[in-house]
């Protein structure tokens, strides 16, 4: 697919826009002022594949904590600010690589200018974030409800405020929990601006519902070439957000690397604990950077044929199974040896 080329923006040592790879974001759910807990979670997320992390900054203590957090992590840190412009300034003074604000709830123009002046002085990007839930009353009335058009107008109004203050180091995010409204909003704003866009479906839900809604919404948006950073917002462990985001990007051909696991849905011919085996295989391959496909099949009758499009695979039988490589059965072995055999092949892949 052809991606839209947006304005290039530097966030710490990462670059978004300008045709650069789409980066994965998440958000910590620790108390930011708890430096040890926050650093530990950021490190876990980094290892899982997170490129940029956002931290809530609801207090001055949290803003000041960013300085120590920054010393101990390897990825850019974004400060999430609401209402108090002084927290935005403090976050930047204590090392935030980017701030996320909604100028509409920061206060007067003087307060917005105070934030922009510090960002300009330090060349720190500002993410202008607008959610459907915070849409201004006059725009709700103008468009007869909460609409994609209203969300886009709100976001661009905020952008123009900052541009009029002489600053354009900006990223835009517009979010709604209504998937189709969100898709339409991103289509509209992408046609009206060249700023990089952070995309996501807000308040998408728990692991199952959130993944489904995010996959549909992000898939529709990204497939049009729209988006420079993404977040899969889930109610749960943020590690799951990274797993889902990586899979969405790989499925759309927007990211290489990382093993894709495919498995059959089970049927009456299944002769092995396929669900358990597939989960163990997923856990096994998570740490490999290989750009290959691994198949996990439930029977030795159809398994080899169905796994022929995979680079590597296993198929289970009654107490035994097959190791399959490039569509060919290479070895028959006891069931308990399947996982070790698969690991050996991964460890020696390409030799």
Specify the residue positions occupied by each region the protein language model found.
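N-terminal amphipathic alpha-helix/helix-capping segment at the start of soluble metabolic enzymes
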Residues: 1-27, 120, 283
């Amino acid at each position: 697919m052809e991606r839209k080329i947006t304005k290039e923006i530097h966030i710490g040592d990462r670059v978004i826009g300008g045709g650069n790879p789409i980066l994965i974001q998440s958000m910590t759910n620790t108390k930011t002022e708890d430096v040890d807990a926050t650093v530990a979670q950021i490190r876990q997320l980094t290892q899982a594949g997170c490129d940029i992390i956002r931290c809530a900054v609801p207090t001055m203590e949290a803003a000041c904590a960013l300085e120590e957090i920054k010393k101990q992590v390897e990825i850019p840190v974004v400060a999430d600010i609401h209402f108090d412009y002084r927290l935005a300034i403090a976050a930047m003074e204590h090392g935030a690589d980017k701030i996320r604000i909604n100028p509409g709830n920061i206060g007067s123009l003087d307060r917005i200018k105070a934030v922009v002046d510090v960002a300009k002085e330090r060349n720190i990007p500002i993410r202008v974030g607008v959610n459907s839930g915070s849409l201004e009353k006059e725009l709700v009335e103008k468009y007869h409800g909460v609409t994609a058009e209203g969300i886009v107008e709100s976001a661009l109004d905020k952008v123009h405020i900052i541009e009029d203050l002489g600053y354009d180091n900006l990223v835009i995010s517009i979010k709604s929990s209504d998937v189709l409204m969100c898709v339409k909003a991103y289509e509209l704003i992408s046609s009206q601006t060249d700023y990089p866009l952070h995309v996501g479906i807000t308040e998408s839900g728990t692991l199952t519902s959130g993944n489904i809604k995010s996959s549909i919404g992000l898939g529709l948006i990204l497939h049009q070439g729209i988006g420079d950073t993404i977040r899969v917002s889930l109610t749960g462990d943020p590690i799951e957000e990274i797993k889902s985001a990586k899979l969405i990007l790989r499925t759309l051909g927007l990211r290489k690397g990382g093993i894709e696991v495919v498995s059959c849905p089970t049927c009456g011919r299944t002769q092995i604990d396929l669900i358990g085996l597939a989960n163990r295989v997923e856990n096994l391959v998570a740490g490999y950077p290989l750009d290959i496909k691994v198949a996990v099949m439930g029977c030795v009758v159809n398994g080899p044929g169905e796994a022929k499009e995979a680079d590597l695979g296993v198929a289970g039988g009654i107490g035994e199974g097959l190791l399959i490589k490039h569509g060919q059965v290479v070895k028959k072995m006891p069931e308990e040896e399947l996982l070790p055999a698969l690991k050996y092949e991964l460890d020696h892949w390409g030799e």
